[in-house]
Amino acid sequence: NFPKGTGFPALPAPQPPEDLPLASVQAYSIDDSQTTEIDDALSVTGLGSGQVTLGIHIAAPGLAIAPGSDLDKLGRQRLSTVYMPGYKITMLPDEVVQAYTLDAGRANPAVSLYVTYDEASLDVLEKTTRLERVPVAHNLRHDQLDHIVTEEHLAQDISQVQIENIPQSLKDVWNELSFLHKLAQHLKHQREVVRGKPENFSRPDYSFRLQGNGKNEPDGSETVHISTRKRGSPLDLIVAEAAIVANSSWGQMLADFGVPGIYRSQASMAPGVKVRMSTKAQPHAGMGVKCYTWATSPLRRYVDLVNQWQVIACARHGATAALAAPFKPKDADLFSIISNFEATYGAYNSYQAGLERVWTLKYLEQNGIAEIDGASHRDDAAGGALARA
């Protein structure tokens, strides 16, 4: 996939528009400590007023990278960041990532979705999309905070949580996280009603960390550390449900304005029915939503950047967005992007999985492990989890 190497040509980071208004929120991101491409952040306003507004703020390279530009061509070639244990090959140059990542301590260009809820019933009252600069107060790291932000602790006031050295950044947003967790549980339940069965979080996530080679590309001599993290933690749930709200809401907005986008759909959850990518807004049975795009990771996935351009056109032009959007209905470019993305993204994921297997064997070798107890997991047709020891 990289016949000319993984380096970047000398391309400056384009500057965002100077007339972006400053949002009156204090946002915070929730990511792993290794994440440098911070695409999304959240904010909550109006707690205790009866109407609470959730802000979902997405990094906005699409405000400055023009379709057809050299940076666009570069993104279209790479199509995604490539992840592997101890290393990654980013989709965009580091100068661009650093200019648009949602770093704490500054106001960052963002495409923001604001959803206002009735505080008691959690019914949706209003949705609006804005292009703005968003002050980010904190970059929270879930691997450092999961032991504090538990379901049990979120039911308490932060002053009652009996854990030493709670970071001030977490204290600042504790009440907001408590509301967001309640909202996320509500949203997940609504989707599960549509799905017809609950989502299954039985499989853990495995994190690979390599020691001994700094930030350089691994050469196989590093010491590998593998840690296990249970999926479905409160912070996981908050981030996941917020992303689903944004991706489904913006997908519907594109459809309402007659602006094409790149959608992910699934006709049913019957065995063998796969997720498809297309330019039509169709239901996603697995997610339990009427339509679903990828628009929340524009620093890491080219499809998200394409969809962000279309969302920006809607935010700027409203009912006439279809005339101003970079991609028109039945645009051959969109179909080409989908085809290339699916092939390339699949190859990247296979490469990552292969390297994870290699480093798992390295881990066994380095730790002198010759025999282990294990279990294999698979999902049955009814959605349950089967395990074999």
Positions of predicted regions on the chain:
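Boundary/activation segment at the start of structured domains
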Residues: 1-2
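Electropositive polyanion-binding surfaces
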Residues: 8-389
